[in-house]
Amino acid sequence: MAPHDDFKTAPVALWLRGRFTNLPRASRMVLLLACAAVILVCMYGTREITEVPQELMEQHLVKEQGGLYRVLKGSAPSVNLVVAATTKEDYSWTKDLKVPGMVVVPYIADDLNATHHAQQNKGHEAMMYHQYFYDFYDDLPDISILIHSQQLSWHVEQLLDQSMIFSLNHLDLREVQRRQFLNLRVTWGIGCSTNTINTTRVNEESGGTPEQKEMQEAFRANFNLYDVPEILATPCCSQIAVTREAIRRVPRKQYEHHINWLLTTGLEDSISGRTWEHMWQYLFLGKAIDCPLEHRAYCRLYHICFGGREEYDEWIELNQGRQKLEEELRKVKGEDGDGKEPEKVEEQKKLTETEEKTKQKSREWLESELKSVSEAIRVRREVAVVRGAVEANRVAEGESLYGDEAEPGVEVKIFPQTVLSARGRSTAVP
């Protein structure tokens, strides 16, 4: 601005100042705030505003507070955690669970004086599950989760740290409500791709599934059906989640019938309990086969999303590679002459002297490779957990849990020639 312009603007400034001072105090405050707003718009109006995704904010909040991994929309569903146990089994680890509103309901198999107990110590967890359904039929929560008493077990997958605490803290309760019944285990290895039940093989012994030859009669007795499904397939191992609606679709009297069958069957206790590992999906869904695609089930149920089938298969292959490296390393470390015949000890010593450097190099190489593979497994798993925190990624993993044209389900991959559907379902009790 040129110096002579001051003479032109000064009278205007004086006039504005006079007008401003003559305004009421409230009007002056409003005018000042309006001016401040205009200045801020001018300063920041051209800047791009980027919002942090809500789910990432939730994930950070939950991580900081050590709580449930998934922040639920709306009020959290009520949950009973039914723990099938004996008096000698410790289930105190349940106090470390972070599921809001969860009530632990222990069912004790061998103590008739316990608050909740089985009528008789028979049928393993199946007896206690049915007793719970019968006892709580009119007082059920939104969701019932029924598990064994062990916190760490092979029944829980390696991807879930083989930990029931990890599994339940990461369980998406909304997904349970959507599906109404599900198995907490998702891998096909036992129950879907191997150790499935063919009910027509009533005379065949099976080392992996000793209950197979009893399944036809067990199914027929429990469901009052003559035409039994040929194939029964679902992930093992009788740890399930089920909604109030699904439980009540089955008449209460039918649970009493299942209890009576477990009490009176001539089958060995271990066999009668195992038959129910293959029948829960039929009881609650009316399906003989319930094997969701693994990577989609992990993504939807536990929010561990690898990004697709190929990426998930790569993670599986890395784990298989790690197992092979561990086996080779054990062999190398065990080649020190233990168990050798006396006349061969001296020869072994000579071989050891000449080959020690080679063995040492092999050991170091195997240890280095094992470390690298283990780190790759860890990183991919952590990335999958982060990816699963975003709902859009869970949707992108695949809509259909049971397969589509791009990725067929278990019926196409494992049982393409088998008639899978049951010929009618009856809930009548004999």
Please give the residue ranges for each predicted region.
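ER/Golgi luminal nucleotide-sugar-dependent glycosyltransferases, focusing on the catalytic module
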Residues: 2-430
